[in-house]
Amino acid sequence: MRYANSQKYFKTACDLMPGGVNSPARAFSSVESDPLFIKDGSGSKVYDVDDNEYIDYVASYGPLILGHCHPQIRDALKEQIDYGTGYGSPTELENEMAELVIEAVPSIEMVRMVNSGTEATMSALRLARGYTGKNKIVKLTGCYHGHSDSLLIKAGSGVTTLGLPDSPGVPASIAENTITVPYNNLEVMEQVFNKYGDDIAGVILEPVAGNMGVVPPNEGYLEGLRELTSKYGSLLIFDEVMTGFRVSYGGAQAYYGVTPDLTCLGKVIGGGLPVGAYGGKEEIMEYIAPAGSIYQAGTLSGNPIAMRAGIETLKVLRQEGSYDQLESKSKHLAEGLAKVADKNGVSVTINRVGTMVGMYFTEGPVTDFESATSSDNDKFVKYFETMLSEGVYLAPSQFEAMFMSLVHTQEDIEKTIQIADKALSKAAQV
């Protein structure tokens, strides 16, 4: 494949934007290359500015569970634009979206719409502190919750890819109120609560850690967190920005049967547009202004364009058989990758929950940040290069998931496995 136009546009972008991108995860620095510039997407495919076609498993880093340019979403957006893009006033669409979310997510009795996952998580922390009257937040090492100061500490996603333990610019006075604990380790969590429990406002985590690849919770782990937080009067906060409506219609909490106090959403609920939400028990959410005294606001929160896209997305997903299809396709992909890895003598660990698939170049098991980062990056780089050159678009980091969509075909999956066979044979030589 040729990438001349992508390289040209990236060179220009580097003079205009820090690192040439508007989000670090999009840079190809960890795979020693320049990023693709995409001009078009349709169904399960994307097309770059050099007219190369790719089977897409990035899915805009998760939101596009219906694929690119889904006709129902496209037509709804075209219709909505004729009525206006925003009013700064409440709309019936916000009610409809809220009803769909509340109906689907077990923990949510009341919801507030925002514009991003970062807004959702930072607002949830403020609410947890205001509601409990406590100061400290516990987060899990390798879990990424956006770029707000309180949470950009031992985070995953691009922070892990770039090898940054945290970020300059986060004041020590803020960092000292964030306690980090290894993922999947209840013993250490209990020790932290024994020491700081009287001042812990909440524990926030990705119930499936999707920003250090795909790391599911050990059996009993989420239940243990639920019991521990309840014992100390702290809130359990699930960051389901990635897992919400992706691992099941009710998210990871429905999948695992553990109900948090607060839930953060994003990605899928916007149908590809910028959106976020946080919600939970009514008695907690009523602390948010104007019902209560904890302030949070947004000029574009609940805007009709994002609401319309989200509504149409959820209507498609709740149709009978949608998640059966997604499960079948995702299982086929994961099992196929494992088979060709074994064929080529490459030690990999493949973790999957619902439509999220993660592959690590390590014998595993991968259960936390330490084991995730033991993956062989040199092997991943060779694998990534071959997959890309043969027409499969993966995130340029081994710490991002592959995302399945409803529009990926069996042909797409079989072709992906065939190309992975070739890519793994090359990775085996590294």
Curated annotation (Swiss-Prot):
Oligomeric form and interacting partners: Homodimer.
N6-(pyridoxal phosphate)lysine: residues bearing it: 267
Superkingdom, taxonomy of origin: Bacteria
Presence of the UniProt keyword Ribonucleoprotein in the record: no
Top EC class, one word: isomerase
Pathway assigned in UniProt: Porphyrin-containing compound metabolism; protoporphyrin-IX biosynthesis; 5-aminolevulinate from L-glutamyl-tRNA(Glu): step 2/2
Protein name from the UniProt record: Glutamate-1-semialdehyde 2,1-aminomutase
Record's keyword terms, sorted: Cytoplasm, Isomerase, Porphyrin biosynthesis, Pyridoxal phosphate
Source organism per UniProt: Natranaerobius thermophilus (strain ATCC BAA-1301 / DSM 18059 / JW/NM-WN-LF)
Gene Ontology BP terms: protoporphyrinogen IX biosynthetic process
Localization of this protein: Cytoplasm
InterPro entries: 4pyrrol_synth_GluAld_NH2Trfase, Aminotrans_3, Aminotrans_3_PPA_site, PyrdxlP-dep_Trfase, PyrdxlP-dep_Trfase_major, PyrdxlP-dep_Trfase_small
GO cellular component, one term: cytoplasm
Family: Belongs to the class-III pyridoxal-phosphate-dependent aminotransferase family. HemL subfamily.
EC number per UniProt: 5.4.3.8
Residues of the signal peptide: none
Catalytic activity: (S)-4-amino-5-oxopentanoate = 5-aminolevulinate
GO molecular function, one term: glutamate-1-semialdehyde 2,1-aminomutase activity
Pfam families per the UniProt record, alphabetical: Aminotran_3
Cofactor annotation: pyridoxal 5'-phosphate
